[in-house]
Amino acid sequence: MTPSLHVAGLRFAYPDGSVALHGVDLTVAAGERVALLGPNGAGKTTLVLHLNGILHGGAGRIEVAGLHVDPADRSRLAEIRRRVGIVFQDPDDQLFMPTVAEDVAFGPANLGIRGDELRQRVDEALTAVGMADHRDQAPHHLSFGQRRRVAVATVLAMRPEILVLDEPSSNLDPASRRELAEILESLPVTVLMVTHDLPYALQLCPRSVILDTGRIVADAPTADLLADPELMRRHRLELPFGLHPVPTAARSSARPG
């Protein structure tokens, strides 16, 4: 099966000459949920912004569901940006219309979708995130957690191949954090989650990748990475007090035969 995402040999340097990515290779299968971990300045945002062609110009190749990300091909780039939906850390960066429904309809409408199909997409996306009852409200009247769910809906309405989430649990109270996790677990899309919230990564993503100094330094089951204290220390990742993940091998051996 064609993977949702295939990145091969991706290198990128900013105009000042600082190299942000050093030959990154990453493949994400369809339907996988993968956490992208790493300290600040590791290159996580730079990598994410390459996935739909916002950043480009370096070496390497990116494919989304088999489609080459080529910023020079404007028609293809529009399809890539439909397939790769990015939910930014601050939902207010994505919500700017008078009502929730208009915000969710904005992307599909720009694709030329109208009438019943547009209404169906809006209804489906808002239902998926539990916000259908708020469709006629102004986004600024919603709580932060509700606005984040609407931001997810704006991307779901595009029917993406990959949902990219930038720090989805930040600034959420415990109930909103749990509700968002339940929503994300229910979505039938590939998920790439950029996060410093290691318990959230453990809860939602069976697999994690650690990026540091522009290189992928680890790629394994999330529990295995978080249970390796030396790996965590080396890449400035810290678990909250009291969290002790059990490696997958230990869990398997503990099962009754």
Language model: regions and residue ranges:
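Conserved ABC ATPase "signature" region
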Residues: D116-H134
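Conserved ABC ATPase signature
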Residues: A138-L142, Q146
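Helix-to-loop junction immediately C-terminal to a conserved catalytic motif
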Residues: N52
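Conserved beta-strand-loop-alpha-helix hinge in the C-terminal portion
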Residues: R215-E238
